[in-house]
């Protein structure tokens, strides 16, 4: 039985909490794509954990965790994150996490190149996290990357890294990068990594009758194929990416949970039709504490975009939704939701593939009354204010997928689970 948790918007929806809840009953928790550019925050027993490349199923003491073949792994960050978790009491974390030997290595060199590539874009910057994810996936696609399994073979990293560095030097000139230092670090990692590296299919076969939880990173609107290209990440962040990155049998998927924030946020550049560059956006940013887990950057904020959510649903085929951060809307007199786009005065029935076109759309809003009541920590549906219930039901009806969970605060316990 496989359960997927996927982001429905631009990321930062709060996927970590529902993953944390579901992982308590999971035997195996997996990351399928992306790298340490992702960021999940989980508050468990009053301890705050920040996850980037590691699956957040590590909080559950019985859960085995896999970083899958579709990911890119920055090895220093892997060990640093593991050390931080063990420092917060997860002493056996190193015994319950494995990396597919087919995952690719994200080098410090890639981070340097990431910054150089952004600089060449001038006013059309993508707004990457600067972690080297794009250049790493580029090297993978060009068949010149290094797989995690190859780190264990003496001399492979040195040969390939020298070749990569020479290629980038020809392109950019001198690099602010210490090639020899990185080569020497990987001589140490060859021994350190060995206990963590596995054949993914062998591990999955051992868990073929187990409860498997797939933790999506980033979100559908950042998908390399289906997102707001080119303002996207460099991996497949939707349903297709999870199947590809983990070699899943699609017939084993029992549920696909889409995580939707009760309003919209975005980090970095790119079109954002419902963005509020005004007091409303500022209020959402401050009240919601909208800062990136990975970069610390302020998130751009706006109203919930149901056009985008319907598009996301059509691609990811959600069977249930988790609406998060409802409590952030507690102090609004009225709340708007985007229900349609207009282009040149006419309502359009498609989601634009061209980012420049998406920048030009006129948003059609519906306005719903606020509830002006504190909802933080509410755990029962009947305890929600009537207008909050109506807001949730409106979203549910528009998207056409049941909202099974409603987040009402940062703690694990701040969640309503509705009977279906």
From Swiss-Prot:
EC number: 6.3.4.4
Active site, UniProt feature: 12, 40
Keyword Transcription: no
Pfam families given in the database record: Adenylsucc_synt (PF00709)
SUPFAM superfamilies xref list: P-loop containing nucleoside triphosphate hydrolases
Keywords (A to Z) from UniProt: Cytoplasm, GTP-binding, Ligase, Magnesium, Metal-binding, Nucleotide-binding, Purine biosynthesis
GO MF annotation list: adenylosuccinate synthase activity; AMP binding; GMP binding; GTP binding; magnesium ion binding
Residues holding substrate: 293-299
Residue positions binding GTP: 11-17, 39-41, 299, 325-327, 407-409
GO BP, one annotated term: 'de novo' AMP biosynthetic process
Stretch forming the signal peptide: none
SMART domains: Adenylsucc_synt (SM00788)
Cofactor: Mg(2+)
UniProt cross-references to InterPro entries, sorted A to Z: Adenylosuccin_syn_GTP-bd, Adenylosuccin_syn_Lys_AS, Adenylosuccinate_synth_dom1, Adenylosuccinate_synth_dom2, Adenylosuccinate_synth_dom3, Adenylosuccinate_synthetase, P-loop_NTPase
Localization terms from the record: Cytoplasm
Oligomeric and partner information: Homodimer.
Similarity section: Belongs to the adenylosuccinate synthetase family.
Function as written in the Swiss-Prot or TrEMBL entry: Plays an important role in the de novo pathway and in the salvage pathway of purine nucleotide biosynthesis. Catalyzes the first committed step in the biosynthesis of AMP from IMP.
Protein name: Adenylosuccinate synthetase
Species name: Uncinocarpus reesii (strain UAMH 1704)
High-level lineage: Eukaryota, Fungi, Dikarya, Ascomycota, Pezizomycotina
């Amino acid at each position: 039985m496989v359960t997927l948790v996927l982001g429905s918007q631009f990321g930062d929806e709060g996927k970590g909490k529902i993953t944390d809840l579901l992982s308590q009953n999971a035997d195996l928790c997996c990351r399928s794509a992306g790298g340490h550019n992702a960021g999940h925050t989980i508050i468990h027993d009053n301890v705050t954990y920040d996850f980037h490349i590691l699956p957040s199923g590590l909080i559950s003491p019985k859960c085995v965790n896999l970083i899958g073949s579709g990911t890119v792994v920055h090895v220093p960050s892997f060990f640093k994150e593991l050390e931080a978790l063990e420092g917060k009491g997860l002493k056996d974390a190193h015994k319950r996490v494995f990396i597919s030997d087919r995952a690719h290595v994200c080098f410090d060199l890639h981070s340097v190149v990431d910054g150089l590539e952004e600089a060449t874009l001038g006013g059309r910057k993508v707004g990457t996290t600067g972690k080297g994810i794009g250049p790493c996936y580029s090297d993978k696609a060009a068949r010149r990357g290094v797989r995690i399994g190859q780190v264990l073979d003496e001399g492979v990293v040195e040969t390939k890294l020298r070749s990569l560095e020479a290629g980038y030097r020809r392109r950019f000139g001198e690099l602010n990068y210490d090639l020899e230092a990185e080569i020497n670090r990987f001589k140490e990692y060859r021994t350190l990594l060995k206990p963590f590296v596995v054949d993914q299919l062998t591990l999955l076969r051992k868990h073929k009758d187990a409860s498997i939880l797939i933790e999506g990173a980033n979100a559908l609107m950042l998908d390399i194929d289906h997102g707001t290209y080119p303002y996207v990440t460099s991996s497949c962040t939707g349903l297709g990416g999870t199947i590809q990155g983990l070699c899943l049998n699609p017939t084993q998927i029992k549920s696909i949970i889409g995580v939707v924030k009760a309003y919209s946020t975005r980090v970095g550049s790119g079109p954002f039709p419902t963005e509020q560059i005004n007091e409303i956006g500022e209020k959402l940013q401050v009240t919601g504490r909208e800062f990136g887990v990975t970069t610390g950057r302020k998130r751009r904020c706006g109203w919930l975009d149901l056009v985008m959510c319907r598009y996301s649903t059509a691609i990811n085929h959600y069977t249930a939704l988790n609406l998060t951060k409802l409590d952030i809307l507690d102090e609004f007199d009225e709340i708007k939701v985007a229900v349609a786009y207009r282009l040149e005065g006419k309502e359009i029935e498609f989601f634009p593939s061209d980012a420049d076109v998406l920048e030009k759309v006129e948003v059609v809003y519906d306005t719903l009354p606020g509830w002006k009541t504190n909802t933080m920590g509410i755990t029962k549906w009947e305890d929600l204010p009537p207008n909050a219930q109506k807001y949730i039901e409106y979203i549910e009806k528009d998207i056409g997928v049941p909202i099974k969970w409603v987040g009402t605060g940062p703690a694990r316990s701040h969640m309503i689970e509705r009977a279906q």
